[in-house]
């Protein structure tokens, strides 16, 4: 009987499901600013095509960012080339001018979900446009990134 328990303990760990990892990719923005005519493009990385995921945009900025909000247009492009366009408004500072994101020194980071409960075929590519009214070149942003993580519940 003890031999059966020991054998089961050795075999069962081999049946464990490998954990699905989160992935992130960050793009460093030019020090001269992000031009509104130049979108950023991301190709999300997925570990398991049968799971559903959450996509989150993260932005890092410094004290030279001159606005309270960051307005973005996010195109989520599916495998069949269908485009799901959404507007994203990231509130980077409160009404008193205090930065809302986490960070240290002169850099701050804030992340907001842009898609939840999607399959890999629903989001093959993500294109992000900055749409700040009256602003062709946006200064003070250092990086923009896409974080892909599996949803907790299927």
Please report, for each region that a protein language model flagged, where it lies by residue.
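Contiguous beta-strand segments within globular domains
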Residues: 41-59, 67-68
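Noncatalytic modules at the cell exterior or secretory-pathway interfaces
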Residues: 50-57, 116-133
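Post-signal peptide N-terminal segment of mature Sec-exported envelope proteins
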Residues: 23-45
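An anionic, turn-rich surface loop/hairpin at beta-sheet edges
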Residues: 87-117
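Exposed low-complexity, polar/acidic, P/S/T/G-rich flexible segments that act as propeptides
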Residues: 72-77, 133-154
């Amino acid at each position: 009987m003890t031999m059966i328990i020991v054998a089961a303990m050795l075999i069962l760990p081999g049946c464990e499901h490998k954990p699905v990892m989160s992935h992130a990719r960050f793009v460093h923005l030019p020090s001269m600013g992000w031009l509104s005519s130049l979108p950023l493009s991301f190709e999300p990385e997925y570990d398991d095509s049968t799971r559903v995921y959450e996509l989150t945009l993260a932005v890092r900025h410094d004290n030279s960012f001159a606005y309270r909000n960051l307005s973005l247009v996010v195109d989520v492009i599916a495998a069949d080339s269908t485009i799901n366009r959404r507007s994203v408004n990231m509130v980077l500072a409160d009404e008193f001018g205090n930065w809302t994101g986490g960070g240290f020194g002169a850099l701050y980071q804030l992340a907001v979900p842009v898609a939840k409960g999607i399959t890999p075929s629903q989001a093959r590519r993500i294109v992000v446009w900055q749409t700040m009214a009256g602003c062709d070149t946006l200064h003070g942003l250092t990086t923009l990134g896409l974080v892909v993580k599996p949803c907790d519940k299927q």
